[in-house]
Swiss-Prot record:
Job description of the protein: NAD-dependent lysine demalonylase, desuccinylase and deglutarylase that specifically removes malonyl, succinyl and glutaryl groups on target proteins. Has weak NAD-dependent protein deacetylase activity; however this activity may not be physiologically relevant in vivo.
Reactions catalysed according to its record: N(6)-malonyl-L-lysyl-[protein] + NAD(+) + H2O = 2''-O-malonyl-ADP-D-ribose + nicotinamide + L-lysyl-[protein]; N(6)-succinyl-L-lysyl-[protein] + NAD(+) + H2O = 2''-O-succinyl-ADP-D-ribose + nicotinamide + L-lysyl-[protein]; N(6)-glutaryl-L-lysyl-[protein] + NAD(+) + H2O = 2''-O-glutaryl-ADP-D-ribose + nicotinamide + L-lysyl-[protein]
Protein name: NAD-dependent protein deacylase sirtuin-5, mitochondrial
Entry's EC annotation: 2.3.1.-
Domain of life assignment: Eukaryota
Alphabetically ordered keywords of this record: Cytoplasm, Metal-binding, Mitochondrion, NAD, Nucleus, Transferase, Transit peptide, Zinc
Cited Pfam families: SIR2 (PF02146)
Principal location listed in the UniProt entry: mitochondrion
GO molecular function: acyl binding; heterocyclic compound binding; histone deacetylase activity, NAD-dependent; NAD+ binding; protein-glutaryllysine deglutarylase activity; protein-malonyllysine demalonylase activity; protein-succinyllysine desuccinylase activity; zinc ion binding
Binding site for substrate: 98, 101
Length: 305
């Protein structure tokens, strides 16, 4: 078992979860290699590749992370708004925040890392090999790059869930409702819109009209059990794992790759810096993912043209 051991307690499994440092006592390990040629030999032989991606991938497309210094929207940190309690207390304010994030994403494009992953997935698929993307990001940039086999473990900015009937539905409207048009500016001096709840996004199912919420994982919420089951299955069968642009300090995704490594599967980390999990991996490639990942995933000389 991989994922089920990592089922986190209530309050620690959000896509905006505060950084939780891994507290294992790592045994003495060999320093990870940065030998791209050696990695490429593993890549050429792999039949089932799992690629775990985090905020670092999207950051290279200019997507705000709302983490660390300056990670504010108006005067609030993301964790102030990304909770069921905040939505219950002030759905207008929370929807302004998510409307802003949705609109920002319309100007962002997949970067070379997204495109390299999508091209690799398509190419290896034609060879009877598989690539699966397990992403902590909620921006759908992997989909826009052309990736097909994507698990969005923290949900999507472009899906909604009805608070009444529970329907989950893709929603790419801009604005998502008329009352939010022009709202959501991030400037701290911006006046709150205070939109009446009946004018916020509503369910379109006949006879429902329930209040919609963003279909993302908030503080105090657990991840979707069906998605975790599928992720567990993918991680158990993979014979090569890449960890791309993730800090490895947020649960449960922080433990995915280390547990894959614990069964002897090569794991390669692509990140701007070392992480608490780096010493557990066979490879570490430091630098922008958009620069380090494409040459790692390009066609190998052993592949048929």
């Amino acid at each position: 078992m991989i994922v089920r051991q990592l089922w986190c307690s209530r309050g620690s499994t959000s896509h905006l979860c505060a950084a939780v440092r891994l507290n294992w006592r790592s045994p003495k390990m060999t320093r990870p290699s940065s030998d791209l040629t050696a990695f490429r030999e593993h890549f050429a032989k792999a039949k089932h590749i799992a690629i775990i991606t985090g905020a670092g991938v999207s950051a290279e497309s200019g997507v705000p992370t709302f983490r660390g210094p300056g990670g504010f929207w108006r005067k609030w940190q993301a964790q102030d708004l990304a909770t069921p309690e905040a939505f219950s207390r002030d759905p207008s304010l929370v929807w302004e925040f998510y409307h802003y994030r949705r609109e920002v994403m319309r100007s962002k494009m997949p970067n070379p890392a997204h495109l390299a992953i999508a091209e690799c997935e398509a190419r290896l698929g034609q060879q009877g090999r598989s690539v699966v993307i397990i992403t902590q990001n909620i921006d759908e940039l992997h989909h826009r790059a052309g990736s097909k086999h994507v698990y969005e473990i923290h949900g999507s900015l472009f899906k909604t869930r009805c608070m009444s009937c529970g329907e989950v539905k893709a929603n790419h409207k801009s604005p998502i409702c008329p009352a939010l048009d022009g709202k959501g500016a991030p400037d701290p001096n911006t006046k709150e819109a205070r939109i009446p709840v009946e004018l916020l996004p509503r369910c379109e199912r006949k006879s429902c009209n329930g209040l919609l919420r963003p279909h993302v994982v908030w503080f105090g919420e657990t991840l979707d059990s069906d998605i975790l089951t599928a992720v567990e299955r993918e991680l158990e069968k993979c014979d090569l794992c890449l960890v791309v642009g993730t800090s490895s300090i947020v649960y449960p995704a922080a433990m995915f790759a280390p547990q894959v490594a614990s069964r002897g599967v090569p794991v390669a980390e692509f990140n701007m810096e070392c992480t608490p999990a780096t010493q557990r991996f066979k490879y570490h490639f430091e630098g922008p993912c958009g620069s380090t990942l494409p040459p790692a995933l390009e066609r190998h000389e052993s592949e048929a043209v």
